[in-house]
């Protein structure tokens, strides 16, 4: 009886290692997109309220209103213009500037983006008074260096 169980177990294992895939399948195309398709910005500040658990001041993040977006895929540039929304308090409106905003962008499917030439990491507060460069690498390995420029109107 034990011998039969071992034989059955070996048979099940042998069948489980068999692949259902056919050989000589066609190769699927690799994503070749290395473009920036949209841009966004936020302003973060320390609010007056405290977090109950820690007692630390609450960090508030509000999205800036995008008023213009010019994307040039051939030149690999994106120019973003943002405005301070009306729901900001007068105190916070006066504090918003390009020295401390958070910028994020949307890129092509399966692409990877890295900062170049000392540019700040996207998604963190940074100085956007000057243009920054980022390399967008497509899944097929092609890389394009993009320049992101931001403008703020109050």
Language-model features: locations:
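C-terminal motif of bacterial Sec signal peptides marking the signal peptidase cleavage site
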Residues: 15-19
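Positively charged n-region of N-terminal signal peptides that target proteins for export
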Residues: 1-6, 21-22
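Beta-rich interaction/scaffold domains
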Residues: 21-154
């Amino acid at each position: 009886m034990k011998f039969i169980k071992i034989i059955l177990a070996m048979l099940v294992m042998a069948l489980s290692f068999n692949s259902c895939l056919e050989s000589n399948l066609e190769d699927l195309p690799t994503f070749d997109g290395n473009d920036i398709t949209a841009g966004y910005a936020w302003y973060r500040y320390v609010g007056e309220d405290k977090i109950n658990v820690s007692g630390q001041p609450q960090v508030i993040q509000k999205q800036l209103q995008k008023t213009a977006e010019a994307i040039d895929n051939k030149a690999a540039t994106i120019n973003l213009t943002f405005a301070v929304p009306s729901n900001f308090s007068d105190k916070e409106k006066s504090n918003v500037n390009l020295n401390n905003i958070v910028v994020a962008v949307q890129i092509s499917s399966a692409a990877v983006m890295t900062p170049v030439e000392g540019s700040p990491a996207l998604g963190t507060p940074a100085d956007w008074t000057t243009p920054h460069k980022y390399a967008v690498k497509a899944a097929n390995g092609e890389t394009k260096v993009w320049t992101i420029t931001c403008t703020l109107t109050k």
